[in-house]
Each structure stands twice: as C-alpha cells, then as structure tokens.
C-alpha cells in the first residue's frame, strides 16, 4: 500500500452486537486507520461490559492517516438520541443510526475515507422512527446518486450477485428486463475487474424459472429476456455462462471455472452462500463511487454485551475492503 488509508466503520444498531464487534476489532493491529462513526460513551461502555481495553483517539482529518494500534480506535463522534440499554431497541436511536450512515457515506464521497464497512442495522426501528429505510444498499445508492448499484455477497470461495434484491416474489419476473440485466451485468463485470483485480471475469448466470424454463415450458423469461441479453454481452467480449438452472449451477464443476454467480433474486442465490460460509460472508455494494463492505448477519440483540458475538464476518469484511483498496490504487 502506497500510503496508509482511512477506513470508516459504522457499528449499526447500538443495542445490538455491532458495538461489541467494533470493540473486538480494536483488539488487533490494522494496516489502515479505523475511523468509527459512533457515540463515544456507547463504545467505552460496551468495552467495559466486555472487559476489553479501548482508547478512543479524536479524528483529525487534516493529519496523515496512521495504522491502527491494538486497543485503540479513531472516533468520529455522532451522539446517541437516547441512552442505550443492551438488547432493547429505542426508536429515537433510529435517527442516530441513519446519521452515522450519512456521515460515513459523505466522508467517502468527499475523499476522506478509502472504504466504508457497515455493522448490522435494525430496519424496523429505523422505519418506526419515521425514516423510510429498506437497507444499506438502497440508502447508499440514493445518497451517492449512483445510477445503479448491485448487491453481492461473498466468501473466500464464492461470490453471488443479485439482479434484484428486496422485492416480493410476485414482482420479480416483471422487474427482470433487458435494461436491468444489461446494467447489472455491466456493473458486476466492471467491479470484478477494478475492485477485485480479475482481468477477465467469468460469470455464471442463473435462470429465473425452474430448470431455466425448460425450453419455454416452465416460463419464457429465459428465452425472451435473459438469453438475448447474454448473447449481446458475449459479443462485447464478456465471459458469461448461462442461463443455467440454479439447482445445477451451484456445483464444483461450474463454480470452479467462475469468478462470480449472478442470481435473479435474493433467495435464489443467498441461501447457498450463507450455508456454505455463514459467519465468514461479506456483503458488498457494487456500482458505488466508493468501496463498501458489510457483515452478513443481523443485530443479534440477545447476544449484545455478553462477549458471545462472533467477529469473524466483520474481520473478513475489513480484510476484503483493504484488498479492494490495494486493487484500486
């Protein structure tokens, strides 16, 4: 790495395990400076609850970034709206969570930070606070004014991107248009090259219907939409294999010769990945003008403050972000 970079982290829901995981991250050295966008008392109280050392250093944007030493974090302060009781949601803190996301996103957009790693949020409490919120992916897409973003989850062995994300099943077929597929595949191909350092990405594409439509007998979306788009993109030089039945595609004979899978909808691709690598998976938002990774689990309110939260996914998310920073330099 040419110079030390700053990575901004949001802990997510303050009553959940996010703050626990941040404190655990701080127990090791990192080659980047970790800037945590959070309430100071929240972090120090959680560290005391876990019996772990933590020193918070003030964020100084005009000073050179320094590698993070064990037991320390750099703090970019955002104040809680309500005091936190571990494991109990407080509606007003939905505003606090969104403030941390907004500040972190803005810092990436203005060049303060080289990447953003997000902890788990509770979508329900944010909406209960009167803030329409469907997820990190959509929030960062809107705030960064990105034309289109793509959700991808990854482990060391498997990357799965989604053509559609948080849609009811009844709406998915109508959402999968030629324009959407062109855009999603272009973003996936571009970011595999630029952020993952893969010179010629090989992408497996799932069909939408059982048996990938069985030649039109189980749905015609493959014939009408997916196959024509793949043929057009192959003519541009992209290495695309599909559409393949999802129950066939996730086998070593296909995956061993691919860099990523494109699933048509959320529950088509993610159950396989989460079964294969739960606790080690990372959520990545492709198409943003900055690097964003996230844990692949929820807030686990029942584990907060008990020292039982597994920091593995957060470590993987941070390590992947660091690799992506190197690839883009």
From Swiss-Prot:
Keyword DNA repair part of the UniProt annotation: no
Note describing how the cofactor binds: Binds 1 divalent metal cation per subunit. Can use ions such as Zn(2+), Mg(2+) or Co(2+).
GO cellular component terms given for this protein: cytoplasm
The entry's keywords: Cobalt, Cytoplasm, Magnesium, Metal-binding, NAD, NADP, Oxidoreductase, Pyridoxine biosynthesis, Zinc
The protein's enzyme class: oxidoreductase
Location(s) in or outside the cell: Cytoplasm
Annotated pathway: Cofactor biosynthesis; pyridoxine 5'-phosphate biosynthesis; pyridoxine 5'-phosphate from D-erythrose 4-phosphate: step 4/5
Domain of life: Bacteria
Enzyme Commission code: 1.1.1.262
One MF term in the entry's GO annotations: zinc ion binding
Catalytic activity: 4-(phosphooxy)-L-threonine + NAD(+) = 3-amino-2-oxopropyl phosphate + CO2 + NADH
Binding site for substrate: 136-137, 274, 283, 292
Predominant localisation class: cytoplasm
Positions of a divalent metal cation binding: 166, 211, 266
Cofactor(s) of this protein: Zn(2+); Mg(2+); Co(2+)
Protein's GO biological process: pyridoxal phosphate biosynthetic process; pyridoxine biosynthetic process
Protein's UniProt keywords contain Ligase: no
Family: Belongs to the PdxA family.
Known role: Catalyzes the NAD(P)-dependent oxidation of 4-(phosphooxy)-L-threonine (HTP) into 2-amino-3-oxo-4-(phosphooxy)butyric acid which spontaneously decarboxylates to form 3-amino-2-oxopropyl phosphate (AHAP).
Additional free-text comment from the UniProt record: The active site is located at the dimer interface.
Oligomeric form and interacting partners: Homodimer.
NCBIfam families named among the record's database cross-references: pdxA
Protein name: 4-hydroxythreonine-4-phosphate dehydrogenase
């Amino acid at each position: 790495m040419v110079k030390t970079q700053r990575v901004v982290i949001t802990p997510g829901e303050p009553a959940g395990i996010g703050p626990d995981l941040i404190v655990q991250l701080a127990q090791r050295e990192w080659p980047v400076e970790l800037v945590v966008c959070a309430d100071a008392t929240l972090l120090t109280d959680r560290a005391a609850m876990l019996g772990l050392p933590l020193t918070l250093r003030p964020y100084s944007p005009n000073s050179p970034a320094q590698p993070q030493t064990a037991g320390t974090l750099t703090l970019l302060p955002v104040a809680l709206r309500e005091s936190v009781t571990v494991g109990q949601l407080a509606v007003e803190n939905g505003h606090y969570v969104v403030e941390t996301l907004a500040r972190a996103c803005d810092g990436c957009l203005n060049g303060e930070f080289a990447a953003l790693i997000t902890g788990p949020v509770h979508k329900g409490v944010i909406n209960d606070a009167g803030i329409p919120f469907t997820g990190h992916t959509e929030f960062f897409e809107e705030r960064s004014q990105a034309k289109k973003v793509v959700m991808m989850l990854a482990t060391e062995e498997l990357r799965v991107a989604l053509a559609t994300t948080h849609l009811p099943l009844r709406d998915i077929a109508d959402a999968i248009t030629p324009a959407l597929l062109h855009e999603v595949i272009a973003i996936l191909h571009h970011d595999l090259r630029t952020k993952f350092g893969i010179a010629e990405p090989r992408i497996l594409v799932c069909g939408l219907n059982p048996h990938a439509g069985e030649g039109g007998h189980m749905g015609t979306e493959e014939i009408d939409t997916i196959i024509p788009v793949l043929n057009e993109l192959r003519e541009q030089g992209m290495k695309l294999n599909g559409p393949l039945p999802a129950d066939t595609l996730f086998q070593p004979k296909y995956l061993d010769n691919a860099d990523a899978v494109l699933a048509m909808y959320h529950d088509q691709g993610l159950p396989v990945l989460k079964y294969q690598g739960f606790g080690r998976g990372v959520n990545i938002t492709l198409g943003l003008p900055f690097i964003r990774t996230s844990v692949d689990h929820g807030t686990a309110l029942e584990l907060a403050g008990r020292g039982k939260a597994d920091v593995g996914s957060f470590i993987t998310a941070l390590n992947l972000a660091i690799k992506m920073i190197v690839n883009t330099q």
